[in-house]
């Protein structure tokens, strides 16, 4: 019994759909997802992979079928049918990519917005008014226009979604130089060549380049942000999986660009506290002397004793100076 062509086409469509859906979710091309935001990025990547797999199987399948079905037969000297264009087919293969691209654009915009890429707290009108003001005040100076653009209150960065904006993040200052990353923790005074942060707590990286443009990239977080000289940028994330992850410069920054790497350590809260305790700078003796003390119960000699010792002044000399009268009145 001959199987109808419509049934064969339906079966082929079902097979292509099943294979595309399975491979789109099980391709294994992405590294481990170390944050909730990474799962959002993986969602759009898996969606794109599903569509790409289906299109690949469909197009390559049609090509292989045509190569076999319409190959030149032995002793066939005839010409093919004079077909010139196919308007319905051209409309179809124009409409399908249009729908796919539009769907991907809407989906990617939604993901980018959820990641905090569009900062609703920064007014774009404010930036425009500032640019117009500088343009009117310094009509002939393009240098002022460029400097204004760098100093404006324009959001440059990516961060948490709106539901997590109220959480107090761990602040880390990041300096990108050829060819290293320097991480400074203002809360503890720690300076490190590696990034350390606890899981399940937002981390805000305030980044700036010291020479050329760099790009801060942690693949496991699915986040990348340009680091620009003279202009700060921000990257906010919330790691969810403990581990060691590479920090990579993703912008060609010089001859040794490939060696500009560091490590991000995602600790448990207890491990992070231990790291801070082990690496926090110890207060020096001079710093300890500046700490507040209960001075109300001290005598003048007791209060001045530590300072006199540091200056090399003996208490006996201070007592002699106290007993002496000033000769200033005799000189006047």
From Swiss-Prot:
Binds a copper A center. It is a multi-pass membrane protein. Cu cation binds at residues 214, 249, 253, 257. Residues 1-20 form the signal peptide. It is an enzyme of class 7 (translocase). It is found in: Cell membrane. Keywords: Cell membrane, Copper, Electron transport, Membrane, Metal-binding, Respiratory chain, Signal, Translocase, Transmembrane, Transmembrane helix, Transport. It catalyses: 4 Fe(II)-[cytochrome c] + O2 + 8 H(+)(in) = 4 Fe(III)-[cytochrome c] + 2 H2O + 4 H(+)(out). GO terms for molecular function: copper ion binding; cytochrome-c oxidase activity. The chain crosses the membrane at residues 48-68, 87-107. One of its GO terms (cellular component) is plasma membrane. Its EC number is 7.1.1.9. One of its GO terms (biological process) is ATP synthesis coupled electron transport. Its cofactor is Cu cation. Gene3D superfamilies: 1.10.287.90, Cupredoxins - blue copper proteins. SUPFAM superfamilies: Cupredoxins (SSF49503), Cytochrome c oxidase subunit II-like, transmembrane region (SSF81464). Its main location: membrane. Belongs to the cytochrome c oxidase subunit 2 family. Subunits I and II form the functional core of the enzyme complex. Electrons originating in cytochrome c are transferred via heme a and Cu(A) to the binuclear center formed by heme a3 and Cu(B). This is Cytochrome c oxidase subunit 2. It comes from Synechocystis sp. (strain ATCC 27184 / PCC 6803 / Kazusa).
């Amino acid at each position: 019994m001959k199987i109808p062509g419509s049934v064969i086409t339906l079966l082929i469509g079902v097979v292509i759909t099943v294979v595309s859906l399975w491979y789109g979710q099980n391709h294994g091309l992405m590294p481990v997802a170390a944050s909730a935001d990474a799962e959002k990025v993986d969602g759009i990547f898996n969606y794109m992979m599903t569509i790409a797999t289906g299109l690949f199987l469909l197009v390559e399948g049609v090509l292989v079928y045509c190569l076999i079905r319409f190959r030149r037969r032995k002793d066939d000297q005839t010409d093919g049918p004079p077909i010139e264009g196919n308007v319905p087919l051209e409309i179809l293969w124009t409409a399908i990519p249009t729908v796919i691209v539009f769907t991907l654009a809407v989906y990617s915009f939604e993901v980018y917005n959820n990641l905090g890429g569009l900062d609703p707290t920064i007014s774009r009108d404010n930036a425009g008014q500032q640019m117009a003001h500088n343009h009117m005040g310094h009509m002939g100076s393009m240098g002022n226009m460029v400097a204004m653009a760098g100093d404006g209150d324009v959001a440059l960065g990516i961060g948490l979604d709106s539901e997590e904006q109220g959480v107090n993040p761990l602040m880390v200052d990041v300096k990108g130089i050829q060819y290293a990353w320097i991480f400074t923790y203002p809360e503890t005074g720690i300076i490190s060549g590696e990034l350390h942060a606890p899981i399940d707590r937002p981390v805000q990286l305030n980044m700036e380049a010291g020479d050329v443009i760099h790009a801060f990239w942690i693949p496991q977080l699915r986040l990348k942000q340009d680091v620009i000289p003279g202009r700060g940028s921000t990257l906010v994330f919330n790691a969810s999986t403990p581990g060691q992850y590479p920090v990579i410069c993703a912008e060609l920054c010089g001859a040794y660009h490939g060696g500009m790497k560091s490590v991000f350590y995602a600790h448990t809260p207890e491990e992070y506290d231990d790291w801070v305790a082990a690496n926090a700078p110890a207060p020096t003796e001079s710093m300890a002397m500046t700490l507040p003390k209960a001075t109300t119960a001290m005598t003048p000699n007791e209060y001045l004793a530590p300072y006199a010792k540091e200056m090399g002044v003996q208490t006996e000399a201070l007592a002699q100076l106290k007993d002496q009268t000033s000769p200033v009145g005799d000189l006047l």
